[in-house]
Amino acid sequence: MKTKEMSEAIGVNPTTIQRWTKYFKIDCDVTEQGHFLYTEKHLQLFKKIKRELDEGKRMKDINLNERQGQGEPSVPTKQYEAKLEKMLVQVDALEEKLATKADDVVSYQLLKHRSELDEMMKLVGTLEDRLLFIEKRMMSHHHQEKQVVNEHTPKKIKRGPWRSFMNLFAF
């Protein structure tokens, strides 16, 4: 049924039918030329809209959701449930892959940190060995220096006790 036929059946202008279609977002078929095609369900819907407007309701106060929901669902329930189940299985598989990937990343990071710690421990060991070697060299060098200093220091000349006593009162 075209817009003009629908308007004649209800008793309103064709532009009113078009305005109601857009305002209430009524689903209907559209021809290649852009003309709306309505069914018998649409006729009943438009009659209810006209009746409520005639009763004094404003267009924004008219609720069509309950009336439009009376038809059959667009997808059969069994088909919907099967599709939903398939999607849930896919979501579970993705979650499992994500968990596995996260475990792999953590394992890799732990191995990387462990190898870095091993390298640092080797470096610390090498530095410790070098430090001990340097300390030994310094100690042996220090002992040699002491011996050389002891050999080259002149022995003190002994002076009498009066000389020390006199040095105390020297100005």
Swiss-Prot record:
The protein here is known as Chromosome-anchoring protein RacA
- Taxonomic lineage of the native organism: Bacteria, Bacillati, Bacillota, Bacilli, Bacillales
GO CC terms in record: cytoplasm
**What start-end ranges are recorded for coiled-coil regions in this protein?**
77-105
Family assignment? Belongs to the RacA family.
Which positions make up the DNA-binding region? 3-23
Q: What's one GO BP annotation on this UniProt entry?
A: sporulation resulting in formation of a cellular spore
Iron found in the keyword field: no
Function, please? Answer: Required for the formation of axial filaments and for anchoring the origin regions at the cell poles in sporulating cells, thus ensuring proper chromosome segregation in the prespore. Binds in a dispersed manner throughout the chromosome but preferentially to sites clustered in the origin portion of the chromosome, causing condensation of the chromosome and its remodeling into an elongated, anchored structure.
- Cross-referenced Pfam families: MerR_1
Q: Which GO terms describe its molecular function?
A: double-stranded DNA binding
Q: List the NCBIfam families hit by this protein, alphabetically.
A: PRK13182.1-2
State its location(s). Answer: Cytoplasm
Kindly state which keywords UniProt assigns to this record, in alphabetical order: Cell cycle, Cell division, Chromosome partition, Coiled coil, Cytoplasm, DNA-binding, Sporulation
Classification via InterPro entries: Chrosome_anchoring_RacA, DNA-bd_dom_put_sf, MerR-type_HTH_dom
